[in-house]
Each structure stands twice: as C-alpha cells, then as structure tokens.
Amino acid sequence: MQNFWFAIFFFLLTCAPPSPLSYASTVTLSRRLLYDYESPLPLPLSPISPPFFPLESSPPSPPPPLPPTPPTTFAVFPTFPANISALVLPRSSKPHHTSPTLLLPALSAVLVIATVIGLALFLYGRHRGQTRHLKNSHCSSSNTSSYGDEQSHITTNFNMAATTSPSEVFYLNTEESDHIRTGGTFFLKQDSPEIRPLPPLPPRSFHHNNYETEVNEEDEEEEEDVFFSPMASLPGSANSSPSHSCSSSCSGWVSPARSFSITMSPPNPRYSDATNLQSPSPERLRVRKNYNGNGSSSLRMFSFWNQNMGFGFPRISSASTSPDRGFIRTPLSSLYSSVSTSPDGLFRKFLDSSPPIWNDFSRNVKSVLLSHTASSRRDFVINIGESSSQQSKVPALPPPTRPPPLVPPSQPFVVQNDVKKQSFSDQPPKQLHWERLRSSSSKLSKEMVETMFIANSSNPRDLPIQNQVLDPRKAQNIATLLQLLNLSTKDVCQALLDGDCDVLGAELLECLSRLAPSKEEERKLKSFSDGSEIGPAERFLKELLHVPFVFKRVDALLFVANFHSEIKRLRKSFSVVQVACEELRNSRMFSILLEAILKTGNMMSVRTNRCGDADAFKLDTLLKLVDVKGLDGRSSLLHFVVQEMMKSEGSVRALEGIRNLNTELSNVKKSADIEYGVLRSNVSRICQGLKNIEALLLLSEESGSYGDQWLKFKERMTRFLKTAAEEIVKIKIRESSTLSALEEVTEQFHGDASKEGHTMRIFMIVRDFLSVLDQVCKEMGD
C-alpha cells in the first residue's frame, strides 16, 4: 500500500506546473533563497490500516476511516525576510506582467491533479470493498470445522486458564496493544472507552442434527437445572498468540451433558487489543447461531438494558455445564458463583450490581438476599483464585443448608426527599360545630311532624290498579292537552252543552275531534262506574261522554269557528281569478307582443305548407320562442321579437312597456298558484258542514233533549245556519262567475274551452312566459 501511495505522490510531483519564478528575469533569480532545494522532501506517512475484525465478534467493528488524502505538493517559492523594506532590489524600467498564457497550464495542471486524486480514491475504495468481501466469505467458510477440533480447543483454553495465578488473570477488554506495551516506534491512538459486549454462548454439544428443534423442549422440561441469566455475557475466544494466553473468561469443559460455569468481567474503561478478536473460531459461530435461535426474549431485553442503560452490571456468562453441576468461581466475587433458577437469586445479583441511585434500597434488602446460597443440588465449587497447586485437587464442599425464609422489613422502604412534605396527620383535626351538639339537647315530636307537614299518602300497595282502555299514544295526547288546558273538565262539558265555540276556541275543538274514541272504547269507558279504576285520560273522556252527541257537537262547533275564515279565503281566491282574466283580456302591451309574435311566425312559415296566413296560435307556443336560436347561437326568436318592437314603438318606451308586463299581470301569477279544483271542493265541504248541523239538531229533538242548555244550543245553531246559508249563496254565485270568466279567456286564446282539460293552465303558461321575457329584456337593456 505504501508503494501505491508513493507512486501517486511521484506522479503528482511530475504533473505539477512549473513555478512562475522560472519565467522571471535573471535579476529576480539572483535573490537569496531561504530554502534548500536539494534537501529531501518529507515523505507522507503511509496510512496505518485498521485491524481486521471478523464478522463473528459480538459488536460490529466501527467502519474503517477513509484513507487520508495525500498532501498536494506545489512548487516551492523563494521566501524573503520579514523586514522586506530593508532589501535593495533592482527595479526594471518597465513593470513585468505575467502573460495570460501562463494561466492555462496552471489551471489545466490543477484539474489534472484533482482528477487523478478522485480516480485514486475511487480505485482504492473499490479494492478495499472487494478485499473485505473475500475475507468475510473466508470467515464464513471456517464455520464448518470439525467437532474434535472444537473439543480440543475449548479444553486447552480451560487448562490454560486454570493454571494461571490470581495475579496473572486478565479480564476481557483489559489487554493493551502490543505496539503500546512493547514501546513501538510510533504512537497508536486508542479507541473510544466503550464497553464491548462479549461473544455469544458456546453450543451445547449434541451429536444429533436436529439439535435446534429439540433443545427448546428439553429446556422447558428442565428449567430448574439450566437458567440463563438476563445479564449474561458470552465468553471470548482464546488469544491467537501465546503471550495472550489468559482469556477474559474461563472456557469450561464441553460435554454431551449440560453443564455451565460462571465468570465475571467488570467494565474496563479501555478497549482491549484488537488482536484478541482477530482469530475467528468455529465454536463462536455455532454458539452465535444457537443463541440467536434459542435465546429467549427476556434474555435479549436484559442484555440490551445492561449494555445501553449504562448501569454497569457484571457480565455473567454460562459457558459449559457438567453432569455433576459443577461450578467455577472467580476470586472477585462469590455471589456470582452460581445461577439460581429462583427469582430471588436473580434479584440478589441485580441488587449487588445496581447503580448508586439504588444504594439505599439495596442496602436494606441485600442483607436478607445475600443469605441465599446456591441451590442445594449443587455439589462442589472450584475457586480459580487459589494457587495452581490447590487447583489440581478440588475439594468437594458439603451441600449448603436450606436458606432461611425472607423476613419482611419492619418499616416500609421510603425514598426520603430533601423537602419534607407536611402530612394531614401532623395537624390535629378541627372540631366542627355539629360535633359539639348533644343528641339529647332537643326533642321533636315525630307524630306532630307527620301530621302537619307530610301529606296523607296511602300505601302504594293499597292503591287500585288502573285499567288502560285507550291507546297509549292517544292517552298521552290527552294528558298533554290537559296540562295545556286552562279549563277544567266541567267547564269544557258546559261549553259543549251551550254550543259556545268562543270559550273553547278552534284549536281545542280540533284536538278534541281527533281524540274521539272508537265504539269499543266508548263501551268500555261507560262500563266503569267509578273513575278511580281508570287513568286521568280515560276519566276525562268518560266525563265528556255524559254530554249527548258530544263529538258531533265538537264537529259542529269546529265548523262554526272556522266558517267565516273559510268564506273569506274563498272570496279572495275567486276575486283573484276574475281579475287575472280581466288583465289578460285588457292588457295592451301583451296584445302587441302576441301580434308581433304572430307576424314573425307567419314570416317564417311563408314557404311551408301553412303558407304563413295563421290568424291565432296557442299560448303554449310562447314557451318555445326561446328555444329557437339564430345563426350566432346566442340570440333567440324572442330576442328578435323584442328588438322589432323596440324599433316600431321606440327603444326606451317599448322596453319599459315590456318590463311592466310583470306588474300589469301580477294577478295572473297569483292565479297560477291556485287550484280551481280545490276551490270547488272547499265550497262543497262548507255546504256539507251546514247539512251536518241541521242533522244534529234533528237528532237532538228526536232524542228528547230539553232544558235551558238545549235551547241555548239550538238557538245559536239556528242563527248560524241562516247566516251561513246566505254566505253559501254568495259564494256559489262568485264561483259561477269565475268559471265563466275562465271559459272566455280560454276561448279567446285557445279557441275552444271544452277541449282544455285544465281550467287554470292558461295562467301557468303566462307566468312562465313572463319570467323568460323579463330575462330577455335584461339582456337587451345591457
């Protein structure tokens, strides 16, 4: 790589443009130079390639820094002393200007240098990526190593770690670089002091191929024997060099049966040398695959918490297990010599490694939780911290006793704050006024209170069950009417007997007419002798039924109350129709407009079968004039007619007269909203109402009605009949005159009234035509 950068540097030196001083005069070249050209130029240091980390390491290595750009060397210019004013330089008579032709070689040289540098960087990056890809594929191919090599490799690591003295024990990530420790010629900057997570767990040895599918079931069945700590870290591989024989964690002996050992590696503020991880081992790859396939979600979550939250938990790694459940204990702590499957063992380790913020809490609980030892099923413990002579013989410890039960603390754990809050218990409660009163201070008579202030209400059980006769909707309407009614039931019955419609009013009479019961309901109401057996609505109707022909009286009084208003409405409608007929016949401007339309139609029909000699046309043609468009596509035949009228009558006068048609024919528009059939039905209904009153009087006389109330009712009804008969005669005369006027207008504009099915249709045609004509006049005026 150094040769590659040296070649680039030499090429840049050869491509550098000549100095502008070479073109200067001889006088300028005679100046004293402060730089020796013969001195060798400082060669650029070759970039130190970062150590290669295999893919099997737990944390991915940071991306390698880009190669430093080689410093661009330019031609060296002569330097001058600081006191340049003291120099006596020869001056020429004419100033020397640099030729513009010298700029082109300089610029081209700069561009060539930039192009060469970019091309070199691109080729170097591409070569580096291809090399990394080849190394990754080579590392992945090493995963297929044999099982025997793995056994020997792990056993060798265990023996090397067991023979080391406590002083020679190294922890993971604590070894320094060889270059720094041996005092190399140059200083290598150390990496960021971050804690790297350990490699994954080694696999449990099985000769079967379906290990990954069966190991989950066995772990669930024997969950008490094997427990993976949430804060577990994974043992590192052995060092590649003999000088680094002490690994960061003691690798246990791997056997077909499951066994494990626990080691600790406290966080180190420095990174370990990268050479510890340069030699990939197949067991690492297999352990990583096994850990990713069978690891529980809780283990991943606690490991993530330990690595990212910065709590500094000790890393506990389970490396191997033995059939006898042997354990390997480090000299740093005896708490982590065993992994208990119970939650209190996990909580004990969590308290021991807790940050300072939990010291108050852990100080109270640690004394209780530390009394728990390893499970009673553990047989022996091996201490690595002892001398090498003692490590050869491992004494078997007696089984520990059962841990004592947890004793709850006498006081609850409360985090004391600096600011003391005042509780309600500190202040004595105030004695209220009501607490000072005595129960025997005053005596009240319960009987007197009930007698004076409590209404006499019978027991709900003693109340009779009310029978519901009417329809629920009808009963609700009657109840609403009684609430809005200002009269009592007796007053209503008296007004019906007297025939006084002014007392009741038209609205009340209309409501009573709608509440008329059926014959079956009327029979049931009359069957109840006592009103307490029925509801208020039924009781009201029962009182009304005592009046003879009560609902016929209600209909008669309602007709009397509405008679005068109906007659007035009929008179107005008939008068409007008659005035509309007169307006159509006597309107001069409307006649001129119809004549202009007739002439225009005859002119357009000259060369047709009709020969243009029509004398009249139906008013339906007025609505079709606006649909006949001219060649311009905008003006219609009605526009042409209005324009011709403006020429003959004068533009201003004709336009104002046409616009005034809406005012002259205002009653025509009102008549278009009136239905002649409705007018005739109203007249017939009034006549039928008079006949119903006469029939009621006859029924009352035949039933033997007598008394002052009957006489009053008969007298009022007889007087009304006389007045109503006179009004009916007048209305009928007005109706006949209106009908004759309609026939005359229809014959005048349509020719034959008998062929017209709709009597009032002529008014609707004129109303629609006037609206279209008004729009045309506005367009013509604009």
Swiss-Prot record:
Topology within the bilayer: Single-pass membrane protein
Compositionally biased residues, Pro residues: 396-407
Pfam families: FH2 (PF02181)
Subcellular localization(s) per the UniProt record: Membrane
Superkingdom to which the source organism belongs: Eukaryota
A molecular-function term among this protein's GO annotations: actin filament binding
Positions of region (Disordered): 191-223, 264-287, 387-407
Assigned keywords, A-Z: Membrane, Signal, Transmembrane, Transmembrane helix
SUPFAM superfamilies: Formin homology 2 domain (FH2 domain)
Record domain FH2: where: 406-782
Signal peptide: 1-24
Composition skew (Acidic residues), residue ranges: 214-223
Bilayer-spanning residue ranges: 102-122
Entry keyword annotation includes Magnesium: no
A single GO cellular-component term on record: membrane
Function as written in the Swiss-Prot or TrEMBL entry: Might be involved in the organization and polarity of the actin cytoskeleton.
Family: Belongs to the formin-like family. Class-I subfamily.
Protein name: Formin-like protein 9
Organism the protein comes from: Arabidopsis thaliana
